[in-house]
Amino acid sequence: MSRTVFCHYQQSDAEGLDFVPYPGELGQRIFAHIGKTAWQAWLAHQTMLINENRLSPRDPKHRAFLETELQKFLFERNADKPDGYVAPLGEE
């Protein structure tokens, strides 16, 4: 049976995550307030950031950057785009 949460990202009820996706207090906040669709959107955005900025998940500075972007993306709706990013037609 799936959980329903009020997704902060989508501003509507959504299917909740099956598990805490990130360690610590931030992970608990994500689990309680973010739906599966929003989490998948973050994973795609994170992949773009890693690829375009040539980030290494092993580098503590890069991990800190990604955590900041995670919070901005899911809870503030103003995450950075890579330099020179051009959205495909039909996207914001």
Curated annotation (Swiss-Prot):
One biological process term from GO is: cellular response to oxidative stress
- One MF term in the entry's GO annotations: iron ion binding
Is DNA-binding among the key words of this record? Answer: no
Which Pfam families would you find in this protein's record? Iron_traffic
Q: Which family does it belong to?
A: Belongs to the Fe(2+)-trafficking protein family.
Q: Which PANTHER family match?
A: FE(2+)-TRAFFICKING PROTEIN-RELATED
> Mind telling me what this protein is named?
Probable Fe(2+)-trafficking protein
Q: Which organism is it from?
A: Xanthomonas oryzae pv. oryzae (strain KACC10331 / KXO85)
